């Protein structure tokens, strides 16, 4: 009927005819009939197949099964199945675009789909109610396209495993509702738009096509193409439906409410609906259209809220963070990469820009692998004048070129100390270094490393150069080194930390001791080139002059030997034999860089009579340009020093005594040879650490037998947390400072590790060459294990924080350390019945909590915290009433007393290493027992554990200062008179013994608030600072100086608080790592054997004091008897007068 009606029309006169309802129904019903009939057929077939399978299972081998398994039929069936399988595999390869033909096929289908959609756009310009005649050239083209779609649909149908699931797929529905109407149009010789708008859903395959064409490669481009395809396909499809129903009207009203709306207007309406903004100029009038708009609005809320902001972010990030940094000539900048997070960036900027915000002209370029978060963006905006963020990776040369790393002053690599896998973090940062060095070998690198054993890879990079400023900041090495120094010298951990912590928060304490502590926190380690007028003078002379005239505390210098193979490096408190040369770098403890510039400006001519430090400025006189210092100037300087000494001491200067440096050096060598005669083969090849043969783990593992207690005394207990799966923390870095060779073998304290045997077994291969180390399997949370280690008589208990766990709460990372501190702190020890010398009533305990009014004391504890904000838990256990109410760790009472440590401040060392890497080298030397970057360059790792080759190398390695804590009354400091102020003590100890005093450890004066007699640290007191009789003094003590006086044996037993005291050990064993017996044994007290002979030189001033024979004999008699030869040599030395030989000093290593 439809065909007859169409044939009666004249095509030339009526190219666009009106489509009747019957024609439109024919187009739509063809699609619905195809869809539902096919679905019903598939369902019926599946039901029949399942029934047959079920019947075969019930009946077993039936007639049908016999037919398939019989002879020729069975073989033909197998061949057909094989052919079908191969055919199906080929089709799947084509459809998955794994082959070139398959890729062409997929791309062709997408292109033809877009072509069919374009034809729909062209035909949509005609009214929906009209039908196109076959004279329209687009109809045959669209018919060809749909014929190809039919072929592709058949291939997909045959390759589908689940036919029903395939039939209900979106692409299948698109084909079913667009292909059949095309063939109906061929039969009716007319075409109608119908549901052809569904072809727009093929746009969802746009990301796949672009990936096949390799047009997109990055994740951002893939994400953007996916979002774009979703939005476009949704808009075009929804606009097509609105265009259809609005132009056709509601079917039950027979189109009476229809409106003439173009496809463009439909898209406009859909976009306005998607943005949830309706302008009202174009609206839906039909019920179907309005119902669709209601549901589409809900879907638009999800679409617009989720996808549009992400697209805007992609566009914004692309413009903001993917550009290149323009390196301007004359503009300095650094590149920072690695762990770019809110915490790391905040810590770095705070330290890099501290106190210099108006002076810094160095820009910071952050190279981050992920776009910054909103919080991080806010930080960058706050420091907009200094920071730039570039999105990229240090592993890619293209990104390194974008940040112009070859023009940067340095490249700083930040590590994440709280990561769960520290080894992986180190390896990734080392790979960044390798990438940067391969890109530009001259770029200066400063890298943070978490585990010390990963440091060895960096110097092996061919372009790594220590001399140009390449540096390594090892968290494990420094952190555990600080804790080890706190175990050796109570309070030293806080003393050293305060020199590198910058406090910007102003606190106004009321108590006097708090004011002293906070004022001392202003002192920092600063460097300055020394004035050429100091050339030719000894270090004690320069240190004394700087202290008295400039109020500067000089503690170390950078020494460069005149010989090619001589020692070059930093020396702490060098002996008088070391002479200051021109352009020597000095290390000071001072408050501001302005103060230390006085050491550069000092002129022996202009400042000869100047006694006010502020008046020592750059004089600019001609004498400063002289190449050599003249004798009159030296004499003038000596005369000035005499006057200052008399002014300070209030006494006439002692008579001048000259002695031969060569003879003193020989005597020192003889004395040391006697001291190390028994263990000269027990140091490593560098002479820096005590060494022993590898010891098996079983031999040092302490067995628990009943209620036994090992008779350790004056030992160090280290509480370790971890299991077999925990990352190693590098306990070797904790042991090395405790086994430094500048302590004699008798001074070494036993180390007892309490922890999991599975964990400590993994660490043991790095510890088995160190003597006197023991392992007690157990847990520090169990008091029974603590008692077994005889913790009551230990000199210090270090509670080490456990290795970080994956996805751990930052507040809970210190749970074990806090609970262990609580357990150990609750131990009450009866001091009246304790035979240990650690209970001294004459000298109150520095951290042992002993009180004269109480018979109980507490175990000295040093706790490590990973999260500094957890300090308030430790403050509650401190035993001090009215402590500093601060959440800042470095303003807490626990920190001021030296009972807590956190490595969080190590982040600031990046800025320190960039501005002045010499300060970092000094810190490494102080906390690691003498290891510096210069030593690491020359030491072969395989030889570190070897035996020292000779006594000469041994002595040169050992002959370095050690940090100690001395009493004003029970040590040789009692010979300093007067000693009422710190300035008098400094000059006297330096003159008499070469001991450099750097700080105080004072008892908190409020006794009612300090029942345990805790002490606090005072860093670099003022020259006029009044001393108290109970003060302990932080000192840099020469190796050849013994510090203890013992007129009677009982006095030594009263000196427990004096650090560097001889270790109280059990009876001597042939094996140094043999654990002490459980039974009680007779204990022997040892005292160090050193020379008391004063060091003198030709440029003598009040420090040169003649020691009479009776005093020498008195001092010598207080020590363990020397060998006959050593005694005779000592007596000879004390009576002789020598001339100076400046080259007799054996340079320290």
Swiss-Prot record:
Biased composition (Low complexity): 830-840
Gene Ontology annotations of biological process type: potassium ion transmembrane transport; reproductive process
Region (Disordered): 828-854, 1118-1149
Transmembrane intervals: 25-45, 102-122, 139-159, 164-184, 189-209, 227-247, 292-312
Span of the annotated motif Selectivity for potassium: 276-279
Stretches buried in the membrane, not crossing it: 260-282
Name assigned to this protein: Potassium channel subfamily U member 1
Species of provenance: Homo sapiens
């Amino acid at each position: 009927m439809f065909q007859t009606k169409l044939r009666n029309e004249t095509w030339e006169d009526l190219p666009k005819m009106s489509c009747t309802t019957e024609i439109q129904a024919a187009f739509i019903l063809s699609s619905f009939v195809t869809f539902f009939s096919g679905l019903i057929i598939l369902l019926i077939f599946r039901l029949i197949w399942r029934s047959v399978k079920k019947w075969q299972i019930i009946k077993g081998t039936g007639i049908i099964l016999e037919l398939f398994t019989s002879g020729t039929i069975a073989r033909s069936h197998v061949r057909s199945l094989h052919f079908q399988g191969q055919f199906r595999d080929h089709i799947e390869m084509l459809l998955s675009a794994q082959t070139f033909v398959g890729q062409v096929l997929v791309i062709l289908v997408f292109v033809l789909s877009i072509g069919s959609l374009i034809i729909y756009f062209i035909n949509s310009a005609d009214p929906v109610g009209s039908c196109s005649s076959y004279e329209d050239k687009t109809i045959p083209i669209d018919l060809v396209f749909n014929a190809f779609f039919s072929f592709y649909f058949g291939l997909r149908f045959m390759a589908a495993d689940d036919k029903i699931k395939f039939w209900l797929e979106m692409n299948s529905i698109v084909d079913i509702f667009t292909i059949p109407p095309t063939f109906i149009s061929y039969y009716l010789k007319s075409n109608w738009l119908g549901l052809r708008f569904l072809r727009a859903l093929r746009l969802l395959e746009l990301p796949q096509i672009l990936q096949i064409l390799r047009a997109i490669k990055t994740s951002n481009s893939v994400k953007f193409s996916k979002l774009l395809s979703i939005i476009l396909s949704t808009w075009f499809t929804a606009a097509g439906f609105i265009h259809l129903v609005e132009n056709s009207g509601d079917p039950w009203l027979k189109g009476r409410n229809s409106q003439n709306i173009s496809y463009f207007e439909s898209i406009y309406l859909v976009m306005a609906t998607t943005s949830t903004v309706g302008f009202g100029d174009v609206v839906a009038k039909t019920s179907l259209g309005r119902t669709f708009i209601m549901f589409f609005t809900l879907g638009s809320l999800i679409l617009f809220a989720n996808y549009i902001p992400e697209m805007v972010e992609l566009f914004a990030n692309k413009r903001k963070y993917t550009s290149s940094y323009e390196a301007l000539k004359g503009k300095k900048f650094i590149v920072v990469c690695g762990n770019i997070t809110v915490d790391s960036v905040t810590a770095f900027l705070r330290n890099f820009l501290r106190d210099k915000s108006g002076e810094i002209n160095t820009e910071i370029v952050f190279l981050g692998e992920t776009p910054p978060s909103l919080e991080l963006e806010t930080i960058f905006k706050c420091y907009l004048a200094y920071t730039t963020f570039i999105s990229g990776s240090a592993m890619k040369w293209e990104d390194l070129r974008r940040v112009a790393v070859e023009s940067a002053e340095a490249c700083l690599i930040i590590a994440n100390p709280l990561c769960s896998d520290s080894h992986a973090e180190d390896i990734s940062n080392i790979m960044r270094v390798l990438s940067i060095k391969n890109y530009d070998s001259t770029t200066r690198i400063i890298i943070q490393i978490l585990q010390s054993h990963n440091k060895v890879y960096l110097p092996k990079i061919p372009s790594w150069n220590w001399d140009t400023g390449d540096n390594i900041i090892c968290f494990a090495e420094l952190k555990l080194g600080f804790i080890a120094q706190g175990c050796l010298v109570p309070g030293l951990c806080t003393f050293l930390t305060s020199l590198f912590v910058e406090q910007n928060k102003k606190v106004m304490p009321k108590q006097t001791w708090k004011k002293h502590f906070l004022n001392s926190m202003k002192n920092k380690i600063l460097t300055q080139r020394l004035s050429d007028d100091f050339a030719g003078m000894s270090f004690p002379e320069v240190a004394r002059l700087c202290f008295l005239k400039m109020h500067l505390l000089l503690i170390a210098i950078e020494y460069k030997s005149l010989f090619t193979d001589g020692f070059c490096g930093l020396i702490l408190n060098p002996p008088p034999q070391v002479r200051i040369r021109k352009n020597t770098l000095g290390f000071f403890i001072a408050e501001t860089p302005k103060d230390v510039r006085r050491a550069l400006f000092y002129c022996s001519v202009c400042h000869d009579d100047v006694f006010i430090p502020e008046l020592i400025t750059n004089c600019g006189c001609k004498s400063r340009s002289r190449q050599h210092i003249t004798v009159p100037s030296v004499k003038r300087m000596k005369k000035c020093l005499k006057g200052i000494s008399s002014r300070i001491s209030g006494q006439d200067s002692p008579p001048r005594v000259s002695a031969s440096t060569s003879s003193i050096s020989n005597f020192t060598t003889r004395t040391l040879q006697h001291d190390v005669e028994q263990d000269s083969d027990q140091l490593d090849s560098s002479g820096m650490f005590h060494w022993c043969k590898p010891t098996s783990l079983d031999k040092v593992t302490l067995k628990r037998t009943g209620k036994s207690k090992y008779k350790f005394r004056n030992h160090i207990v280290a509480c370790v947390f971890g299991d077999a799966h925990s990352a190693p923390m590098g306990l070797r870095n904790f042991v090395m400072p405790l086994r430094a060779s500048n302590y004699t073998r008798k001074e070494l304290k036993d180390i007892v590790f309490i922890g999991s045997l599975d964990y400590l077994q993994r660490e043991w291969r790095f510890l088995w060459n160190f003597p006197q180390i023991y392992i007690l399997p157990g847990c520090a949370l169990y008091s029974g294990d603590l008692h077994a280690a005889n913790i009551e008589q230990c000199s210090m208990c270090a509670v080490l924080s456990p290795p970080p766990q994956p996805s751990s709460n930052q507040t809970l990372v210190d749970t074990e350390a806090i609970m262990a501190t609580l357990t150990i702190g609750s131990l009450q020890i009866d001091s009246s019945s304790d035979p240990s010398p650690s209970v001294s009533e004459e000298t109150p305990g520095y951290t042992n909590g002993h009180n004269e009014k109480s018979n109980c004391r507490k175990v000295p504890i040093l706790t490590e915290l990973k999260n500094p904000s957890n300090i308030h838990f430790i403050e509650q256990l401190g035993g001090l009433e009215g402590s500093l109410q601060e959440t800042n760790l470095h303003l807490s009472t626990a920190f001021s007393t030296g009972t807590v440590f956190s490595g969080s401040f190590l982040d600031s060392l990046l800025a320190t290493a960039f501005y002045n890497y010499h300060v970092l080298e000094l810190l490494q030397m102080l906390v690691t027992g003498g290891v510096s970057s210069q030593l690491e360059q020359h030491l072969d790792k395989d030889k570190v554990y070897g035996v020292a080759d000779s006594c000469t190398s041994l002595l040169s390695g050992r002959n370095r200062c050690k940090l100690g804590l001395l009493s004003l009354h029970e040590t040789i400091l009692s010979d300093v008179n007067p000693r009422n102020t710190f300035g008098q003590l400094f000059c006297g100890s330096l003159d008499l013994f070469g001991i450099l005093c750097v700080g105080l450890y004072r008892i908190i004066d409020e006794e009612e608030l300090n029942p345990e007699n805790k002490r606090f640290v005072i860093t670099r007191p003022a020259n006029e600072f009044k001393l108290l009789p109970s003060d302990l003094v932080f000192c840099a003590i020469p190796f050849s100086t013994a510090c203890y006086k013992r007129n009677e044996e009982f006095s030594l037993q009263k000196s427990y608080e004096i650090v560097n005291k001889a270790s109280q050990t059990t009876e001597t064993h042939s094996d140094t790592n043999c654990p002490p017996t459980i039974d009680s044994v007779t204990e022997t007290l040892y005292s160090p054997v050193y020379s008391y002979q004063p060091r003198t030189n030709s440029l003598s001033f009040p420090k040169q004091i003649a020691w009479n024979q009776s005093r020498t004999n008195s001092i010598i008699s207080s020590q363990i008897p020397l060998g006959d030869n050593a005694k005779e040599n000592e007596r000879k030395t004390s009576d002789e007068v020598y001339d100076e030989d400046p080259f007799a000093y054996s340079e320290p290593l």
